[in-house]
Amino acid sequence: MFSLKMRASSNGNHVSGAERLVKEEQIEEISSELIKRAMNHENGVPDFINLKVEKVTENINYIEHLKIKTINSNSKETSREFAINILKKELENYFLKNGKDTKKIDELIDSAFKIIDAGNMRGAAILDLDGNRLEKSSDRGIRVRNIDTAEELSKKILKDGSLTERTVDAIAIATKVVNCDIIAELCTSDNFSYTTGYVATKDGYFRILNLKDSGQVGGRVFFAESSDIDELYDKLENMPVIVY
């Protein structure tokens, strides 16, 4: 298997990114698809595209995908209430386990929304239970690498008319992170017109419509219990995972 990583930017600002794990005979075809994806992105034509092809020498981990649950909402305010409630339910268990004041959960979640609404990070922010930023670079963040969605699962997702290629990409990321010591993930798309976001926990991938306004930037935040940031980075970046 080979890892394909595509990153595209314009004037130093992130435009598009994607990860694939493919067989050797698929490299040319998938590389072309990734470049086309970068060149046709709604956020603009990039002036820089990086495509990295690297042989995977570690064993591939196959992980069953999180169950996809769609929450319909017509307003950002209502959608965010749904997201907050899902996050609070999950975070409360970890706050109690670590003897922390559960009244601080609202403040922690509010910090996460401020991060995603600010946008322009190339990767995800990581917050511990005290609200500290753990990522090594606050501009770059951390990228979840060496992932893909199994072809059968991709086809199944795309058969559902309400789901998209973005869902295929997101389910791989969400499934990997909650299996790598991340408590929960909050995400909105960096595509300006795509307003659906999600919350991921061990209970599922909660796809929430209208989690941001059209034209608004997006972002990604991981909530982590562990302070061993080097181990966390190693798992998220280097552990090869195919989600089925």
Curated annotation (Swiss-Prot):
Q: Which keywords, in A-to-Z order, does the entry hold?
A: ATP-binding, Biotin biosynthesis, Ligase, Magnesium, Nucleotide-binding
Question: Any idea of its EC number?
Answer: 6.2.1.14
Q: Which Pfam families match?
A: BioW (PF03744)
Would the keyword Magnesium be found if you checked this record's keyword annotation? yes
Q: Which residues form a coiled coil?
A: none
A single GO BP term for this record reads: biotin biosynthetic process
One GO MF term on file is: ATP binding
Query: What catalytic activity does the UniProt entry give for this protein?
Result: heptanedioate + ATP + CoA = 6-carboxyhexanoyl-CoA + AMP + diphosphate
Q: Which HAMAP family match?
A: BioW
Q: How does it assemble?
A: Homodimer.
Family affiliation: Belongs to the BioW family.
Q: Which NCBIfam families match?
A: PRK01322.1
Q: Name it.
A: 6-carboxyhexanoate--CoA ligase
Q: Which gene encodes it?
A: bioW
